[in-house]
């Protein structure tokens, strides 16, 4: 049940992080702005997380974890109230920064906490359940957020997220035990971790592949509507399919990762890259786009969990610091990808985002090949 609480928390944090993707056109319209400009809100959020993850985690390293989580949820809820009331884009952006600060610490400590509260022989499955919560954000959170935004307005979506977060906070207060900070690491852990070349290589891989993914994914909603010219209902269904695929990705991770982590990561990357490269090619074939999005969803979920697990395996002595750097790297990728996508839209056009995102993914795949050969003798775990 305790792992379930963390899974719910992952659900609500991932829902709010990515729900602007589903509401981009509506937010842009309400503020009379272009989607590509509003999309920079995703970049700003991600960069706050990337810059804040490590220093905020270090500042909170000695705080008892349950108390810290309750504080983060309070900040999360208040920021969503401000989002729902935002009277201009800059107020909305400010509210998103509050959420980003909560996000910075939450994802820095959550993976290690889930492993701590899980039964001794169920730690990998517990991490998979955490990832399932993230996937459900794509399955239910994003489509429901879009539906609420269409029926009412986008502000209502943020209000509902704040309400659900309040319920999760109450469950957390009731169910979680006292959780002293353990193996959090200190500032001195950072140079030690940076002397582990495979770990550094994984962090760089995260930045590269996630940049490619979000170059395309940040603008998938306007792409489907404007380039593919599918209806808003089909767009919502495609976002649902993307999230549903994440469940399959979590399942694949649980079954296959332990057998050969390197091959699993490479396989997941191929599933992320190919649909992006072919997105424009098959833009008007509805069933092909559905298939591409499904495979893409499997790939990105599998890849995210696999990379996070690899980081924890390579830094068992400083899990929170390693997770904070992972979260920061991931969000550098998100922010860079959203920025690259905006530049591509302005310079080349919306139709080219898949080509550029896929090309960045290919560079990441070459980098994976390089570090695999370079550190081939590194013990497989």
Language model features: what each stretch is:
Residues 79-82, 90-98, 287-295:
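Paired small-residue
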Residues 263-307:
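C-terminal transmembrane helical hairpin of 12-TM major facilitator-type secondary transporters
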Residues 51-90:
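Conserved MFS/SLC helix-loop-helix module at the cytosolic interface between two early adjacent transmembrane helices
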Residues 32, 64, 85-91, 102, ...:
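Helix-breaking motifs and short loop linkers at transmembrane-helix boundaries and internal kinks
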Residues 53-64, 249-261, 345:
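Helix-to-loop junctions at the C-terminal end of transmembrane segments
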